[in-house]
Swiss-Prot record:
One GO cellular component, as annotated: cytoplasm
Gene name for this UniProt entry: tdh
Active-site annotation: T40 (charge relay system), H43 (charge relay system)
Keyword annotations from UniProtKB, A to Z: Cytoplasm, Metal-binding, NAD, Oxidoreductase, Zinc
Subcellular location: Cytoplasm
Upper classification of the organism: Bacteria, Bacillati, Actinomycetota, Actinomycetes, Pseudonocardiales
Protein name as annotated: L-threonine 3-dehydrogenase
Primary role: Catalyzes the NAD(+)-dependent oxidation of L-threonine to 2-amino-3-ketobutyrate.
Amino acid sequence: MRALVKTSPAPGLELTELPDPTPGANDIVVQVFRTGICGTDLHIDSWDEWAARTVPTPLVIGHEFAGEVVAVGSAVTQAQVGDFVSGEGHLVCGTCRNCRAGRRHLCANTRGLGVHHNGAFAEYAVLPEQNVWVHREHVDPDVAAIFDPFGNAVHTALTFPVVGEDVLITGAGPIGLMAACVARHAGARNVVITDVSEHRLELARRVGVDLAVNVAETGIADAQAKLGMSEGFDVAMEVSGQPSALRETIENMAHGGRIAMLGLPAERFQIDWSAVVLKMLTVKGIYGREMFETWYSMSVLLQSGLDLSPVITHRFPCTRHVEAFETARAGRCGKVILDWTVR
């Protein structure tokens, strides 16, 4: 099979031939149709400090994918050959306190598909049965391939009630855009998104936000005034990882406001804890997806008409992976998809 491999501890990836995988007793083999390029994949490609201390080589990378089950292990009980599936990229231990309590997204022993174990940027991928979501209704393969980051967006957007609320989203990358789609679809009153990239802000306008703000030019307080708001945002979603974004978010929250924080800062930073206390704010960290409640929510949202198509802006055959990665890294895009069905 063809696979995109980090062959050595150095920058770059190689599209190479590997033996087709075989399933263990509890595993399934998926013929991969589409994959999505994630920021994690860009880190592994460039071989930055994080990748060098985290990722073993050689390794098939990639964790966002969709495809068809083509083989199952002897102990598999639910997935069947022919099922169309997406993959959950977090591999959990199944034996810790949280796993045994059904809180698998809180497993302290989580490992990453395409980070610690061979991933899905290949014509075939193998993973545990418990890590696949079977699509019972039709889902576009491109959309099915990004259920992993879509799940991050849904987990973030729905962790607090948004019906009738004024919502602020800091960061208009693919996850921020999908979070905006979800918040709007779920009944938020105003949805405001911020970024410093006009290209991404234009994508946000296409998905239907009420206001897209370039914070290099305009403050969030000015956005409040433009929408006729006077008491601050009820719910915020920080997905940029920028310290300044969280600081300005706190300044613009309503008393009793709630902040879902998915963005990962590159280093420690200070915030105004006095404002958090005096405003009685709730700040909640978000990591991955709730397995598999978030996946159920994703499917229901799509079945009820949520449209993610504007978020997917570029598609490449896997043979043009270098161009695809360059496009994703440049940032003038939404989600970038690799097609593994073309030779």
